Amino acid sequence: MNSINIAIDGPASSGKSTVAKIIAKNLNYTYLDTGAMYRCATYLALQHGYEAQDVSKILGLLAERPISFGKAEDGSQTVFIGTEEVTLAIRQNDVTNNVSWVSAIPEIREELVNQQRRIAKDGAIIMDGRDIGTVVLPDAELKIFLVASVDERAERRFKENQEKGIESDFETLKSEIAARDYKDSHREVSPLKAAEDAIEFDTTGVSIEGVVTFIQEKAEKIIDMKN
């Protein structure tokens, strides 16, 4: 059976990761969490007190301690930097609030994009991020761009944090998400934008199941056409 690559892009907390993981499981595809890779680079930078001018040092750490993915007993994805599991550590607020400047560094993006492309070359990959359809996998057979209101996205992040035992304030999350949107869409390197051939879908008020069904039907149609 012929497989395809699926690119899902969109702003922070638009539901990309949740949806991508479910579709990957349903189609028996590999889910590649690109956002987690940038969070790993950010986590390393913060751990060592590195700033934007310390690019070569951050790249050195990424080379010494490569990022990899595993599976927990319940089937959920785990993230490692070298041998250290960082699945929860990279979701802390300090990492979230610093990931934009790290991911805007051209050399770091280039290194991680090369890793992502190598993984995707055999197909059957679902990737989500902010520039998958435009930069990482411009030849992906299916490109989706998810959007949702700031209020809805803040609510999702708030619930997510509660479930993980991370303390957060709803109004603070709203302003952080709005600021993140601005930074992501105005950065010089790979700004957040939909690919010209992407299908845009507003998930405000739409259930996760509804979004999954919408994307999976599109994917299955393309897969059928290839067979």
From Swiss-Prot:
Cellular component aspect of the GO annotation: cytosol
Catalytic activity: CMP + ATP = CDP + ADP; dCMP + ATP = dCDP + ADP
Keyword Signal: no
Keywords: ATP-binding, Cytoplasm, Kinase, Nucleotide-binding, Transferase
CDD domains: CMPK (cd02020)
Molecular functions per Gene Ontology: ATP binding; CMP kinase activity; dCMP kinase activity
Domain of life: Bacteria
Binding site for ATP: 10-18
Subcellular location: Cytoplasm
InterPro entries: Cytidylate_kin, Cytidylate_kinase_dom, P-loop_NTPase
Primary residence: cytoplasm
EC numbers: 2.7.4.25
Top enzyme category: transferase
Entries under PANTHER family matching the protein: CYTIDYLATE KINASE, CYTIDYLATE KINASE/PANTOATE-BETA-ALANINE LIGASE
Name recorded for this polypeptide: Cytidylate kinase
